[in-house]
Each structure stands twice: as C-alpha cells, then as structure tokens.
Design a protein with these regions (language model features):
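Conserved N-terminal phosphate-binding loop of PLP-dependent enzymes in the Aspartate aminotransferase
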Residues: 1-230
C-alpha cells in the first residue's frame, strides 16, 4: 500500500487520483491510504493499523496545492516521519517536481533536515525543457532496475544539456536565496497593490512558490476573473 496526504497533487496518472475521478478504476487506487499532512499521531495510527502492508509514503515537502493556503510542517515533523518509515521498512518518497531547487539546491528534503529514499525533480531542473529525474539511495537501484520502463525521448541531448547548464547556473546564482528575495518582493507588492484597490490578498507558502488568493472569495470566481484579466 501507498500512503498519500490529503490535498496532494502528484500528477494525473490513474493511481494518483481518487476513485470518483472520471476514468479511474477501483483496482488502480485499491492500495492507496490517505491521512492529513502534519498530523503525526494520525500517520502513526495509520502505520499501526496497516502494519506490514505499507510499501511507501509519497508526499510534497510542504502543502503547496491549489485552492487552499499553503503551509509548512511543524518543527521536527519530517524527522519523526523519517524514523517512522525506517522502523516500518517504508520507502519515503518526496515529490519535488514543483518545489525542487526553489528551497535548496540539494532538494527540499535537505531544506527540512531529513533524507528521502526517493526524490523526483522536473520543471526547474532544465528551465522548461522536457526532462525529469528520479534520484534515490544506492540500495534501491537494483529494485528499480528490475522495473520495465521505456520512453521515446531518452536520446534527446538538448534537454540533458539544458539541465546541466541550468543546474550550474542555479549554483552560480544561489537561486534559492535569489528566488526567496524576489518572491518576497513580488508578494509584498501584490498584497499592497490589492489593498490600494480594496482587495485583501493572502500570500502563503514559499515566496518562490507562493499561492495567492483573494480573501472572502469562497467561490473563487473573483480569483478567476482576476487571473483572466492578467
């Protein structure tokens, strides 16, 4: 079984969806378990209830989904999760597709002071070029090598070159610090501009990957109109 945190987003493959989504079969999500992020007692209980049945836990480094304010885990949360996974032989997987390189060039797990067993990157990895990466600990290589996987663009040299150039550039510029500074400047400016026009804007999450919403807009219609006008 695989543990997911409620409110997650891990792409659109059927196994990452909920059963009530169109086209998703019961068999594809039969082994999915769900629990609230940052609720360690609930996670501990879930591990106890399904002891010996859980193979992996997949998560974003912090809750940075849409339609809800983003938030960080409590201090020490990830360290407790890491130990819980170790004690139960569960693979800890971090989905760093969106947040990767924005918080720490070594990965968002490094930012929070723990080490994932598997971590995946995309988006910022090559500044928009079509390449992604799955990194993990040495002991999992033999397991992964036994999984059948193929692709049409593995010999595309340009995305790989772009990825190497992008990573070198990010190291040179210390982009996590730069993105944080620029993000704070941008979100502060947007909130101030909103106030000047009678709107209460709320910015949450990392300044380099912020979520912005209009307060008291339960239907999100104002938000959609605003985005459309931009």
């Amino acid at each position: 079984k695989i543990v997911f945190f409620n409110g997650y987003y891990h792409g659109v493959s059927p196994w990452t969806q909920k059963l009530d989504y169109s086209g998703v079969l019961e068999e594809e999500v039969a082994n999915n378990l769900y629990v609230n992020f940052n609720d360690y007692p609930a996670l501990e209980k879930l591990f106890s209830d399904y002891k010996g049945e859980i193979a992996g836990l997949i998560a974003q480094p912090y809750m940075h989904g849409n339609f809800n304010d983003n938030f960080f885990p409590d201090e020490g949360y990830w360290q407790k999760v890491r130990k819980l996974c170790d004690d139960n032989g569960v693979v800890l997987i971090i989905d760093d597709v969106r947040a990767g390189f924005r918080m720490d060039l070594a990965g968002s797990d490094h930012y929070f002071g723990f080490k994932a067993d598997l971590i995946c990157f995309c988006k910022a990895l090559a500044n928009g070029y079509n390449v992604s990466a799955l990194c993990g600990r040495e002991s999992l290589k033999d397991v992964v090598s036994g999984i059948t996987f193929t692709g049409s663009y593995w010999m595309s040299a340009v995305p790989f070159a772009a990825g190497i150039a992008c990573i070198n550039k990010m190291k040179k510029l210390n982009t996590p610090k730069l993105f944080d500074e620029l993000g704070r400047e941008l979100t502060t400016g947007l909130v101030k501009a909103g106030q000047e026009h009678g709107f209460h804007l709320i910015a949450s999450g990392m300044p380099s990957l912020f979520y912005l919403r209009i307060a008291d807009d339960d239907s999100l219609m104002l938000h959609q109109e605003w985005v459309a006008d931009m």
